[in-house]
Structures are given as structure tokens and as C-alpha cells.
Regions:
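Hydrophobic anchor at the beta1->P-loop junction of P-loop NTPases
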Residues: 14, 42, 307
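Pre-Walker A adenine-sensing motif
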Residues: 1-7, 292
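SF2 helicase catalytic motif II
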Residues: 126-127, 140-188, 193-194
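Pre-Walker A (Motif I) flank of P-loop NTPase domains
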Residues: 7-13, 38, 119, 301-304
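Conserved helix/coil segment N-terminal to the catalytic DExD/H
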Residues: 103-147
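Conserved Walker A/P-loop ATP-binding site and its immediately adjacent core
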Residues: 37-62, 67-80, 125-127, 310-313
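Interdomain helical connector at the RecA1-RecA2 junction of SF1/SF2 helicase-like NTPases
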Residues: 198-329
Length: 342
């Protein structure tokens, strides 16, 4: 469907639920558009996603890809182990060296053009200026020599937003401008399209601001394909799930454990202790709900959980306490309850 769409249009939207294969689908669209030769750009909002896309495309490509990585973080090619709250994502090791040096990008693009074949620039939106300047240098010396056959905008909902009059565009919005980033085709893909209300659009127009909303075909093109979560479950592409909402209080903490917390024998407060008790109960499927509803499809306890914390410091603290607290909680239970707990 994208092949037919791109014969008449130069922009299109791909809406796919998480886990249904957006990255792989985009690869196949790119291969179809380039026929195994040419130049493509894959834009992502983070270094981690860049690495993920790079590895996925290099692994699944049917023809060899010459990758060029343009990343806004000069340290992206080496591992930073320490994490702090000012940088909530570890800078990962990239599968290929990254650069933000314009001359280096120009040289790599020129060499790729001379060699032929398929070249893909993997870049973060934040480094889009580097890509644009490299393109401009090459096109100035040889007009039209560096035009992307396809730009893939991953997490395209990040490219929406408002640009006020007389203010600079954000790096995420610049991708829409074909003068800034020349390309034959643009593919916008996301699981969560961001749309603005008619009221927001009217206010932006009154303020002479530019509003990028994903239902604007002039910016994003038509929606070519969509598969939501429900349809993906029906097609057995994704597993269905249930949401369990449970309430816990300090009364759910055994008295002996409460005493240890009160006396400062454990580095955890009552509130966090109650949350951990709730987590253990949920994993054990010990809740006051219909037993058949909860355990009927799968009577076994759950074995893993994801906990969200306010800061990295807190998450590290909780992670270090889980085993100790879990064991003390288990020891404080009666024998009948112990048999029900993971």
C-alpha cells in the first residue's frame, strides 16, 4: 500500500501498536523505495533508539547497508556507567561509531555516493542540523547530489507542536521542511499519534503560530496503514492483558515487620513497605477479587514486575531493598500464607 501511495504522494503516516513491527515494516518500505540503492535517513529521539534501529536494520536488511551514525552526544560511542538524575538514560555503546562533525559526515556521504549501494544515515532529531549542513555542502558543490530517497521519522508524535511567530523551530519540527532537509519521500511512524483540538488550532492561527498536528495531511501526509492494539491482539500479533488495581495500607504489613521499620532496623519507610507488600501480593495473585477471574486463565503466580520510581536514586534504593524486605516479609507470615506467596 505504501508503494502505491508513494507513487502519487511524498508523505505518509504509519500507525502501528507497540510491538507489531514498525521498525521492520519501515525497513521493507525503505528497501522497496530504494530498490537496494540510494540514500535514506532514519531519525529517532534518543541514542538508545538509534542503536536499536541500527542493529535491527543491519540484521534484517535483504541488501547490505552502509550505515552512517550522526549523534548529538559526542560520548555516544563509549559506555558511561554512572547514572544520575540529570541524565535518566545511560549512553549506550553504539554498534557503529557516531559523529557530529560536519566534515566527517560530508566525507562519509561522498564516499558512500562514490561506492554506490544502499546508505542509511541513522541520526537523532537533536543532531538534525549536522545532517542538514552536510547535505547543503554536498548539494552546493553538485546540485541534487545528496537528496534522501526516504526519511523515516520514528516516534513521529515527537515532531508535533507549536512554533511561535519569530521564534526558532525545535529540532523535532525541522524535519518537515524539505528545503532544510531535501528528500523525495517522508514516512512518519508512531504507535501514539498526537492530534490537536480544533480550539488549539484556532488559537495557534490567531497567534500566527505554526501548529504541527498529525492529522494535517499537508505536513504528515495521509494515513496509509493503521493497526491498533485491539486488532493486533485479534490477529495474535500481541498478547492481551488484564489490569489489576489493588489498594494496600500499613495494616497489610505484619506487626513484626512494622516494628523493624519503626525502630529503624530497615532502610525503608512504611509507605514504600506497603507498596512492596502490594507488589508481592499482586505477583502472588493474592487479592480480594473473583478467584476464577484472577487465576482461571493462568493459576500460576507471576514471576516478574516493572516498578516505576520518581528518581533513579529511589529506584536504586528500592532495588537494593527488595530481596531483604521480601525475605523478612515472608518470614513474618504464617505457614498458610507462606504457601500462597511467591
Amino acid at each position: 500500500s505504501f508503494h502505491q501511495h508513494f507513487q502519487k504522494q511524498d508523505r505518509g503516516r504509519l500507525i502501528m501498536a507497540c510491538g507489531t513491527g514498525k521498525t521492520f515494516t519501515a525497513l521493507k518500505i525503505m528497501e522497496q523505495q530504494t530498490k537496494g540503492e540510494g540514500l535514506a535517513l532514519f531519525l529517532v529521539p534518543s541514542i538508545a533508539l538509534l542503536n536499536q534501529a541500527l542493529i535491527a536494520w543491519m540484521t534484517d536488511a535483504t541488501v547490505p547497508i552502509r550505515p552512517i551514525c550522526v549523534c548529538s552526544d559526542a560520548k555516544a560511542s563509549r559506555k558511561r556507567v554512572q547514572l544520575d538524575d540529570s541524565n535518566d538514560m545511560a549512553v549506550v555503546d553504539l554498534a557503529r561509531p557516531a559523529t557530529t562533525d560536519i566534515e566527517s559526515v560530508v566525507q562519509q556521504l561522498h564516499q558512500a555516493s562514490e561506492a554506490g549501494g544502499l546508505t542509511v544515515v541513522f541520526a537523532t532529531y537533536q543532531s538534525i542540523d549536522v545532517v542538514s549542513k552536510a547535505q547543503a555542502i554536498l548539494n552546493e558543490s553538485a546540485p541534487g547530489s545528496c537528496v534522501f530517497d526516504l526519511i523515516v521519522c520514528d516516534e513521529a508524535h515527537r515532531t508535533t507542536g507549536v512554533t511561535l511567530k519569530d521564534s526558532d523551530e525545535s529540532a523535532f519540527v525541522k524535519v518537515h521542511d524539505n528545503d532544510f532537509l531535501p528528500a523525495a519521500k517522508r514516512l512518519y511512524m508512531t504507535a501514539t499519534p498526537r492530534l490537536y483540538t480544533e480550539d488549539s488550532k484556532s488559537k495557534a492561527k490567531e497567534a500566527e503560530a505554526i501548529l504541527c498536528s498529525m492529522d494535517d495531511p499537508a505536513i504528515y501526509g495521509e494515513e496509509v496503514y493503521r493497526i491498533g492494539f485491539g486488532e493486533a491482539v485479534d490477529k495474535q500479533l500481541l498478547s492481551d492483558y488484564k489490569v489489576l488495581v489493588l489498594t494496600v495500607s500499613d495494616r497489610d504489613i505484619p506487626p513484626s515487620l512494622q516494628k523493624s521499620i519503626t525502630n529503624g532496623e530497615m532502610e525503608i519507610n512504611t509507605d514504600d513497605a506497603a507498596k512492596l507488600v502490594g507488589c508481592i501480593s499482586a505477583l502472588s495473585k493474592r487479592m480480594l477479587v473473583d478467584e476464577e477471574l484472577l487465576k482461571g486463565p493462568d493459576p500460576e503466580p507471576m514471576r516478574s514486575a516493572v516498578a516505576f520510581c520518581s528518581t533513579i536514586k529511589v529506584s536504586k534504593q528500592i532495588a537494593s531493598l527488595v530481596e531483604e524486605f521480601g525475605q523478612k516479609y515472608y518470614d513474618a507470615l504464617d505457614e498458610e500464607t507462606k504457601a500462597e506467596v511467591v
